[in-house]
Amino acid sequence: MCKGLAALPHSCLERAKEIKIKLGILLQKPESAVDLVIPYNEKPDKPVKIQKPSLDEALQWRDSLDKLLQNNYGLASFKSFLKSEFSEENLEFWMACEDYKKIKSPVKMAEKAKKIYEEFIQSEAPKEVNIDHFTKEITMKNLVEPSPSSFDVAQKRIYALMEKDSLPRFVRSEFYQEFIK
């Protein structure tokens, strides 16, 4: 640690860490310049205001990953927390699977399935999720003919992992604790 930071009171350093975590999602760059382009004939959508949940809603997150993931503010908070721990791949996989299930076109479904597989499932994938060999095999077999349920087994395993591991860490984090004060 540099001498300048060592001279600061511990509470200042802790507050700086909290701010970094809370702003983490805002500091991300778009994945490509295409994300910044607005098509000529479309009007940009009004930004969705994420309303801060009530204390009661936030307290329910402790016991229910479903409630956390269904709340836009909770989802954004959870994602920021996981990014701060460099462990966001499970949530990103779960979200990609949710988006995948909404696809109607068989061609687009096959393309998205391939992308999800290459990004999260295959060995040495850039964001490889931690699933057992049996689950990988089932998922690979399901992808021979992609359907909305192709990733269900893997998604359920990852959900269980987040529920057992990530959610308790999030609930114990200063980020969540500050929020419910």
Swiss-Prot record:
Q: Which SMART domains match?
A: RGS
User: Single GO cellular component annotation?
Assistant: membrane
Q: Which CDD domains match?
A: RGS_RGS5
Keywords attached to this entry: Cytoplasm, Membrane, Signal transduction inhibitor
Residue span, RGS domain: 64-180
Which Pfam family is an annotated match for this chain, by its short name? RGS
Q: Where is this protein found?
A: Cytoplasm; Membrane
Could you mention a single GO BP entry for this protein? Answer: negative regulation of signal transduction
Question: What InterPro entries does the database record attribute to this sequence?
Answer: RGS, RGS_RGS5, RGS_sf, RGS_subdom1/3, RGS_subdomain_2
The UniProt function text for this chain reads:
Inhibits signal transduction by increasing the GTPase activity of G protein alpha subunits thereby driving them into their inactive GDP-bound form. Binds to G(i)-alpha and G(o)-alpha, but not to G(s)-alpha.
According to UniProt, the name of this protein is: Regulator of G-protein signaling 5
Native organism? Sus scrofa
